[in-house]
Design a protein with these regions (language model features):
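Carbohydrate-interacting/catalytic domains
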Residues: 1-148, 176-186, 190, 454-457, ...
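Short catalytic/ligand-binding loop motif for oxyanion handling, primarily in non-cytosolic enzymes
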Residues: 101-102, 160-162, 202-205, 250-253, ...
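Substrate-binding/active-site clefts of carbohydrate-active enzymes
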Residues: 111-113, 133-149, 155-341, 610, ...
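The feature represents the membrane-entry module of six-transmembrane cation channels
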Residues: 154, 319-320, 369, 420
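A short acidic, glycine-rich active-site loop
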Residues: 217-221, 336-343, 452-454, 498-505
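Conserved alpha/beta catalytic core and glycan-binding cleft of carbohydrate-active enzymes
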Residues: 308-310, 328-490, 519-529, 533-589
């Protein structure tokens, strides 16, 4: 065999240590030329198999034509098949530890058969010519701590669809078709990043991509791996970052997938008390097994290094950290200290984040962690988990509870909007209004708001203004920036026709104005983790449900003052205490951007325990964003 594609002793050693970070360049299916014959090199890890062969379109799915040879004690099997070609389907035929016959998709496949088919597809991931050199070079200097990040969360299959036909029931846009449309929208709105859901092969559309069978394969619903790279490339050339949802917490029990891969629990724990998620009906990875850890960490590196993705949002982190997550007494096994912490998962996260961020400066690792686990964004060397950012689920829950209330009752729940500032600097946060909040009868963002339709729009504008003023990066799920009325469904596109109505059009423009102001003023993003850069002007005006606060820039120039009114009562002479005797320029109100601005001069009138103040005519559900 050629030297390049051969599973060497060094490969075996590193894989056994869990540190063969380029393992996906060896395991899987790779076009190669050996002994002057073109074909494909196949390799698979099946440590307890009795025998393995590769079957596919190149050998008429004959289980005896291409047996694979076991390489060393670690349990990797390899072979070279002359004449096998790019585009052909294949599987591994495994004689299991107990003699069972198993037909498995390739865990390291870079492409898969279109569902409901379950085979893997031969492809060449090395033949894409990137054109995003400028972006990749600049990325090395990107620092999430001091940079603007406004993320547009997108499900690619339902963002926008073709009209459905008999030949194309799904109506999906391909990655290449999606690229210019998505880039144009994101750029026009003013988002900095796109976060894509479901970009790993999954058999069931209704899982939204959270039950993965092909970790190294972009879903074939939307095209090839090369097409996916084109999407990333295109976004980068338009100066848009891309983050992927990534699901290392669990995997489904589909027979062609990872479950009982060689007739034994290879990727999962054998004991159901450790290896089963009762809530989700899925399997839990064995994070203590080096080869499994290697599979996942190399997968993260595959997306970041091979596909140029700028970061990963790690799903369901809490379910990995707690051994008793979603389980009753008797359904879980304590750790060696008798506790409920998953020590192996903790070490996995430290290893993962250290390697990914250490090898790829300027990328981000984001945790969806729903508990108060400490130091999620703390450095691994300081016993933190090493993530760059964490979703702020506490803020989200309090914010949504407050916003749903009839304005009369908000005064009794004023602390729901102020409480988050008591822990805002305990982690590095992203404020999220994600897909999870607009499904399962939770209503769309607009429909959550109280009152008549007109009031709903006003409430939402005020709420978004508060969100964009609050410390933390921002994330909005698709459709919520123009007031999608229906809940989200993966089976249909967003209700774009709503933009034919003035209210929806105005909301979309308003959100775009917020996005552009957010990016323009470092006060709103440059000191997110500096407690001295935030100051309440009045956090206690509960009777009138008005909040006012200051965001300071890292240089303390061009600071921002924000006032938000969450009742339908106008306050024509609302007095706002201010830090200094200066001019305060109104740059945005509830109608949107004010291109020329309007100046308010501070007077020597005591208000909000401050020497200076000015009167601002605050409309019903009105807001004011000022620079000074």
């Amino acid at each position: 065999m050629g030297k390049k594609l051969q599973f060497t002793e060094l490969d075996q050693y590193l894989f056994g240590q869990g540190t063969n970070y380029d393992i996906y360049r060896k395991l899987g299916a790779h076009p190669d030329t050996q002994n002057r014959k073109k074909g494909v090199y196949f390799a698979v890890w099946a440590p307890n198999a009795q025998a393995v062969s590769v079957i596919g379109e190149f050998n008429e799915w004959d289980t005896e034509k291409n047996p694979m040879k076991k390489v060393g004690p670690i349990g990797v099997y390899e072979t070279f098949v002359p004449g096998a070609k790019i585009g052909q389907l294949y599987k591994f035929y495994i004689t299991g530890a107990h003699g069972e016959e198993l037909y498995k998709a390739d865990p390291y496949a870079n492409a898969a058969e279109m569902r409901p088919g379950t085979a893997s597809r031969i492809t060449d991931i090395t033949n894409y010519k990137w054109k995003d050199d400028t972006w990749m070079k600049n990325r090395e200097n990107f620092d999430p701590d001091t940079s603007a990040m406004s993320i547009y969360e997108v499900h690619p299959g339902s963002w926008m669809k073709h009209p459905q036909t008999a030949e194309d029931e799904d109506g999906f846009y391909s990655y290449r078709e999606l690229a210019p449309k998505l880039a144009q929208y994101v750029k026009k709105m003013g988002y900095t990043h796109v976060e894509l859901m479901g970009i790993a092969e999954h058999p069931f559309d209704g899982s939204w991509g959270y039950q993965v069978t092909g970790y190294y394969a972009p879903p074939s619903r939307y095209g090839t791996p090369q097409d996916f790279k084109y999407l990333v490339d295109y976004l980068h050339r338009q100066k848009i970052g891309i983050i992927l949802d990534w699901v290392p917490a669990h995997f489904p029990k589909d027979a062609h997938g990872l479950v009982n891969f060689d007739g034994t629990a290879v990727y999962e724990h054998a004991d159901p008390r450790q290896g089963e998620h009762p809530d989700w009906g899925t399997k839990i990875y064995n994070y203590g097994r080096p080869e499994v850890k290697n599979f996942l960490i190399a997968n993260a590196l595959y997306w970041v290094e091979e596909c140029h993705v700028d970061g990963l949002r790690v799903d369901a982190v809490a379910s990995m950290l707690y051994l008793d997550y979603g389980k009753k007494d008797g359904e879980w096994i304590a750790n060696k200290y008798g506790g409920n912490k998953n020590l192996e998962a903790i070490e996995f996260f430290k290893h993962l984040n250290t390697v990914v961020l250490g090898r790829n400066h300027g990328t981000v690792m984001i945790a969806e962690e729903s508990t108060a686990w400490p130091m999620v964004t703390g450095k691994a060397e300081d016993d933190g988990l090493g993530f760059s950012l964490k979703w702020n689920m506490g803020w989200m829950n309090d914010f949504l509870e407050y916003m749903k209330l009839d304005p009369y009752f908000r005064k009794f729940n004023h602390n729901k909007m102020t409480f988050s500032m008591t822990y805002a600097y305990s982690e590095k946060y992203v404020l999220v209004l994600s897909h999870d909040e607009v499904v399962h009868l939770k209503c769309s963002m607009l429909e959550k708001m109280p009152g008549e339709l007109d009031d709903k729009f006003k409430n939402l504008k005020a709420g978004y203004t508060f969100m964009f003023g609050h410390p933390g990066k921002k994330l909005l799920f698709m459709g919520q920036d123009f007031g999608q009325l229906r809940e989200w469904s993966e089976a249909r596109e967003l209700d774009w026709y709503l933009l034919g109505e003035e209210n929806h059009q105005k909301l979309q423009q308003y959100v775009s104005d917020l996005l552009h102001i957010y990016r323009k003023y470092p006060a709103l993003y440059g000191a997110d983790n500096d407690p001295s850069a935030f100051e309440w002007i009045n956090a206690n005006d509960g009777d009138r449900s008005i909040f006012s606060f200051v965001r300071k820039s890292p240089t303390r120039r061009n600071n921002i003052l924000i006032v938000c009114n969450f009742t339908p009562v106008a306050r024509p002479d609302y007095r706002v205490g201010v830090p200094k005797k200066k001019q305060y320029k109104l740059i945005m109100d509830e109608q949107g951007l004010l291109p020329k601005g309007k100046v308010f001069k501070a007077e020597k009138k005591n208000c909000d325990n401050r020497e200076f103040s000015f009167a601002y005519p605050l409309e019903a559900y009105g807001v004011g964003i000022f620079t000074y």
